[in-house]
Structure formats: structure tokens, C-alpha cells
């Protein structure tokens, strides 16, 4: 597991109040982890802060699973 993958899973668990062991790469934030739209906005903000990148709204809407978040950070993290 990469450092980015570990960090993303930790942030997801903290933001959504779930056990880190329950955060799988294929987990959907809304369907599997119980996030609502406000949770996902806060999650994106936490990812932006943690990785020092900006995630435009049109991209944030497409990040619906843990793996998509990991892929986005890997592609856009300096």
C-alpha cells in the first residue's frame, strides 16, 4: 500500500467517522461509507489540505470512491 493510499484511507475514515479497516479501495463514499453531500465536500477539502492541491468542483463530483480519490491525488500531487 502506497503512502498516498494510506493517507487517503486515514482521511476518509476520520472525515466519515468509520473504522479505517472498513475503508476499501472500491468503497463508495455514499453507498458504502454512508457519506452525504456535505460529508463529501468536507472530505474533498481535507484531501486538498493534506496533499496541498486544489480539486476543482467538476473533478470533485467525479471522485466517488476511495480508489478514484487515490488516483486523482497520484495524478495531481506535485
UniProtKB/Swiss-Prot annotation:
Pathway: Lipid metabolism; fatty acid biosynthesis
Record has Cytoplasm as a keyword: yes
Gene Ontology molecular-function annotations: acyl binding; acyl carrier activity
Modification O-(pantetheine 4'-phosphoryl)serine occurs at: 37
Protein localization: Cytoplasm
GO cellular component: cytosol; membrane
GO terms classed as biological process: lipid A biosynthetic process
Processing and modification events after translation: 4'-phosphopantetheine is transferred from CoA to a specific serine of apo-ACP by AcpS. This modification is essential for activity because fatty acids are bound in thioester linkage to the sulfhydryl of the prosthetic group.
Keywords: Cytoplasm, Fatty acid biosynthesis, Fatty acid metabolism, Lipid biosynthesis, Lipid metabolism, Phosphopantetheine, Phosphoprotein
Superkingdom of source: Bacteria
Coiled coil segments of this chain: none
Function: Carrier of the growing fatty acid chain in fatty acid biosynthesis.
Family note: Belongs to the acyl carrier protein (ACP) family.
Name of this chain's protein: Acyl carrier protein
